[in-house]
Amino acid sequence: MHRTVTLLTVCAALAVASPAPRAQSAPDIDALLGAPFPTELVAAPTGGGFAWIASASGVQNLWVAEPPAFAARAVTAYRDDDGQWLSQPAWSADGMTLVFTRGEGPNREGASPNPAQLADGTEQGVWATPIRPQTTRETPRRLGAGNSPAPAPKGSMVAWIDRGQIWIVDLAEPEAKPARLVVARGSASSLGWSPDATRLAFASNRGTHSFIGVVTVATRELRYLDPSLDRDSNPVWSLDGTRIAFAREFAAPRPAMFAPRRTAEEPWAIRIVDVKTGAARQVWRADQGYGSVLQGLDAENQILWGAGDRLVFPWEKSGWLHLYSVAAGGGSATELTPGDGEVEHARLTPDRARVVYHANHGDIDRRHVWVARVDGGAAPSAVTKGTGIEWAPVMAETGTATAFFRSDARTPPHVAVQTGEMPARAVEGTLSAAFPTAHLVEPTPVMVTATDGQPIHAQLFLPPGLKPGERRPALIFSHGGSRRQMLLGWHYMYYYRNAYAMNQWLASRGYVVLSVNYRSGIGYGLEFREAVNFGATGGSEFQDIMGAGLYLKSRADVDPSRIGLWGGSYGGYLTAMGLSRASNLFAAGVDFHGVHDWNQGIRTFRPDYNTLEETAFARKAFESSPLASVDTWTSPVLLIHGDDDRNVSFVESINLITALRKRGVEVEQLVFPDEVHDFLRHANWVRAYQAAADFFDRRLKAKPSGSQQ
């Protein structure tokens, strides 16, 4: 008979099945997750300062740091863990106001997330706040519904997008009402002002194709530039405002989701159009083969218009995502960032003669900051190196300071600034002296061998106080994505910052933890990312998890009968794959919002996906799913899911629990009403991780005869 255990049952069980006592110095998960997490660093257009958003125990605020002291100062005063995240900060042209987005976008039913069940509901909106408020009236004011604020580079206008339409308002007029700039078909994105702030470029997505549009603000005249049957995106203005460059991906059948795509039938291209005449021409096109697919990076635009009339862009010609540049007049592309490693984030310096970026060249399981010349006239120079992790660099408008985020194995993410030739230093106020740094462990890089022979990178966390001869329970963590990579330290993404904290906490509770960078993730090149038969085309990455399990089983410090799995999203998929196909190896698992049937997972993103029209693909997709092998699933599992998940449908967990109950598998569950995929509330992360740890303690910490703990 089946047995489904609710959290009330869990709490009762804990009273009689508490784990072995732990040292009082062990860190608490609330403290680990409560450390401020900074994100979205932007440089002021004047004065040499920076701004960013930080979340501390779920409370979101906007911060600034200005020279010469560069001490952090909050410019908003939100106080609640209410799930209303801040994002997309941008400076006004005079550097005196910050605009930002508050809240998350609506789901298909038109409802914005409300995980705190606020009585009046929620709505995503664009807000503005002065960086030096003089009165309470000058605290953040709401400009209107929407997101993606784009202040003009001159004057006081700001534009943004609401439900695919462009809106605009004058920041200098406190009583001004926002107005829709133009009524246009399609869904607008990638807003970009002309240098003189008279026109606004954007991409218009029409579903099957997309255009580049330009609106003259004063007259509201709308024109589409070089329209075609293809997909145009990423418009960027020339420095003199006379031309726009953009990327063109040529019309082709929609590529399969969660399937390898190493090449495109028609390689992507860069085109330039004269805004006045409409004359357009192709200035560069990718070669056939590797790099023919446009693979993006974290940047304000995939094409950056640099000094010397050169265009900077990402290209995977070598099998690694690198930066290249080409003259706007056309010609061959020049590689700017050679070597084995991937560029992940890039921005131009204020003089546009250089690009500052982060990459994993020479240190594949970390990130460091580099600078390269736009013309490729010299080798890139490393700004940071060593055992730290540094990312998202941006240079001050003055050119005298570079700010970036930094962490290491023990020190959580914080803001750092480097001025002149001085070593980088933490920005005052972005690190807590109370954080339990000394009680964390340093993960060790290890290589494991998948069951098909593929070498796989992983990080091993050993519990403190592990003695020779002891055999501890062990856990494998699988990240989500799958386009992700776990690092040898605190992660640069919030979701995986939390996962790293969880792995540290589990190690402090006595577990050997192995974090696996399975195939189809990033950081190791195109062939690894676009792995043969991964995802819906065969689930080949499951072989990496099996190899990791066998690696742990072979270790003298691991009890082979007490190996578990945990992960979220794609990691939840791999957790479920392990339990459904190898319950003899994996004794228990915690599955956060996992994909359990690829056909359902694809339909979440493509509602028009029809398994009856794509029968062969759909059959293979199901065979690559946990539900296809649920008959051999015997190990207990904890399912955790928010019911407003827009990435992995809540029905995925409903279908799985139904199948497991029919087969008598022990299932526990934790559900968060109105919560999304990447939990918006700190309290929900804490509760979920506590439930996961309690589950593993009860399932894996009981001592089998002859074993030691």
Task: Specify the residue positions occupied by each region the protein language model found.
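A flexible loop/linker signature enriched in serine peptidases of the S9 family
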Residues: 53-63, 78-85, 101-127, 141-148, ...
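A short helix->beta-strand "capping" segment at the edge of beta-propeller domains
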Residues: 24-38, 72, 140
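Residue-level detector of Asp-centered blade-edge/turn motifs that repeat once per structural unit
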Residues: 45-46, 93-94, 153-154, 195-196, ...
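Hydrophobic beta-strand positions that form the internal "hydrophobic ladder"
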Residues: 50, 98, 158, 200, ...
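Serine-hydrolase catalytic core recognition
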Residues: 382, 389-709
